[in-house]
Curated annotation (Swiss-Prot):
NCBIfam families: PRK10708.1. It comes from the Bacteria. It comes from Sodalis glossinidius (strain morsitans). HAMAP family: DsrB (MF_01549). Belongs to the DsrB family. This is Protein DsrB. It holds the Pfam family DSRB.
Length: 68
């Protein structure tokens, strides 16, 4: 996933929320995404772990073509 891609994020106790990627930082354990949400337009950081499917919080919006 790249800058400006539309994504959904997993948050505690609710449905997945749609947002837009504002920044991407790669680490050895996974990838951090700064995602703009409707109620947090300046963004919130979410971490996707490489080693665990339960640690995936950011996913591409289904059915949208992602920018390259």
């Amino acid at each position: 996933m790249k800058l400006h891609n539309r994504v959904t994020v997993k948050t505690d106790g609710g449905p997945r929320r749609e947002g837009t990627i504002l920044a991407v930082e790669e680490f050895s354990e996974g990838v951090m995404y700064l995602v703009s949400l409707d109620d947090y337009p300046t963004g919130i950081w979410f971490f996707n772990e490489l080693s665990s499917p339960d640690g995936i919080f950011v996913e591409p919006v289904v059915g949208e073509t992602q920018a390259k």
